[in-house]
Amino acid sequence: MSLPRGGVALLGCTAGIALANNYAVQPALGDIARDTGTSTAAIGLVTTAALAGCIAGFAFLLPLVDRAAPRRLVTGQLLLLTAGLLLAASARGLGPLLVAYVVVGAGASVSAMASAIAGRGVPGERRGAAVGLVAAGMSAGILLSRLIGGALADAVGWRGMLLVSAGLVLACAGGAWWRLPDERPAPRGGYLATLAELPGLLRRYRALRRAVVQGSLWYFAFSLVWVALTVRLAQPPYGLDAAAIGLYSLAGALGFAALPVAGRLGDRYSPRAVICVSMAVAAVGAGVLCAGLGRPVLTGVGLALLDAGCFTAQAANQARILGVDPRRGGSLSGVYLLLYFCAGAVGSAVAAPLVSRGGWGAASLVVLGALVLAGGLALGWRDASASAVPGGRSAGAARWGFARSSPRP
């Protein structure tokens, strides 16, 4: 299977727009609670429902990448996402809204499909750049969704915001049907057999286990720092409202600008080298944040560095996973992202209690510790290919993963 010209860019836009729907509703949760007669405490379950749907999508839908044609698979899942958004826009109570957001979350998992399809649909020596471009779209969707969602909800109401989102997703579905290939991969066994082998992939592939551990550490840190930031800035002496806090996401959004470059570096050097450097950058950002939140410019610099490091490491990690066995790219990505997002959920869950008990200092130190541990593991866990010394580079460069990658067939 080969992607047409512009196919990777289309997948990147699709991934960003789809994944944004898991987060865009969050600034409007107060309005939704009032309109549906739901308590403030209960309305937070909408976010949980979206996450549950997304995790289910990773587990049960993402392995279909190894079995179905990209055109039909991506289009079908985008139509599922559109249906979930329309159902949410028409919901009159909490129950229908939660059902709708489970569907929305499952549909939004198409973002991970886009990454796997992009990695499979280009030559091996361009895999990192392709995955990096899709990761940039996903990161932009996550970081800008709350800002844009809040602005749309203010302008046209939360139901109108969901209808606009549904229209954008439907446009992506049309683009996917028009541009993505209709070539079906050769399946290996039945669908249920594919699901049954998912736990065994962790036992079989050491590279997958390492990717899961490292990725879980930095996504735990990423999720923790953003929730902790929101909680702390809403408290005295800052007392910022949701709109003002949302502006900090613009600083974090600077980080995804590094992703396309990082993807190309991942094709030139080993993923391990990119991850080591990325974690060093993220740890510097976390160290800046440890200084406190009293200076907004310094906080913005810390967030930008932390996000750039985490996003770049994620692109390299996903490219490494897809390179383990491209024929099982969907299944491998499904296992990885399932555990990756579970780690993020843990980070989000512990953020508020950590801030309330230990303050911002405790939260930022935990973030720094997780990033340093992820970087230390990347240094200690040598890639299997590191012993090769392609292109005449020194053995020392190969040992640390900075030897140029050999072109893949």
Per-region residue spans from a language model:
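Helix-breaking motifs and short loop linkers at transmembrane-helix boundaries and internal kinks
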Residues: G37, A69, S90-G95, G292-L293
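Conserved MFS/SLC helix-loop-helix module at the cytosolic interface between two early adjacent transmembrane helices
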Residues: A56-R92
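Helix-to-loop junctions at the C-terminal end of transmembrane segments
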Residues: G57-A69, A258-P271, V355
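Primarily marks hydrophobic transmembrane alpha-helices of the MFS/SLC 12-helix fold
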Residues: R71-V74, L97, I275
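Cytoplasmic helix-loop-helix junction between adjacent transmembrane helices
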Residues: Y101-M138
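Helix-loop-helix hairpin linking two adjacent transmembrane segments in secondary transporters
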Residues: L133-W178
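Juxtamembrane intracellular "pre-TM" segments in multi-pass secondary transporters
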Residues: P181-V213, A403
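C-terminal transmembrane helical hairpin of 12-TM major facilitator-type secondary transporters
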Residues: R272-A315
